[in-house]
Amino acid sequence: MKFNNKRSGGYSASLAAQLFDSSKPIHSLSLDLEPQMKFEDGKRTDEVQAYKAWFTQAGLPPFEVKFETKVALPAYLSVVEFDNIEACEVSYNVYFRAVDLKEVN
């Protein structure tokens, strides 16, 4: 996801709150988690560092969220809420991470 305001610092819950519209649902797009492998000395290892999945909200482009542990993904297009979602801007790109997610009925 691209963002047009330059900020400094690392991950922030307030930046995530600015980007999402709390009145609109967030839908899960991924069927499976994508493992993010660890790299050492520029070489890929067999160790999984994190897991990523794709989501969408009306008015925003699809976005990827990183989880440090394996989470249970709900069915395609299920409405979800994140546990401790944070965002980080790097060179006008925004990256997200969360502790967990849950399906909202």
Name each model feature, range by range.
Residues M1-N105:
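OB-fold and OB-like single-stranded nucleic-acid-recognition modules
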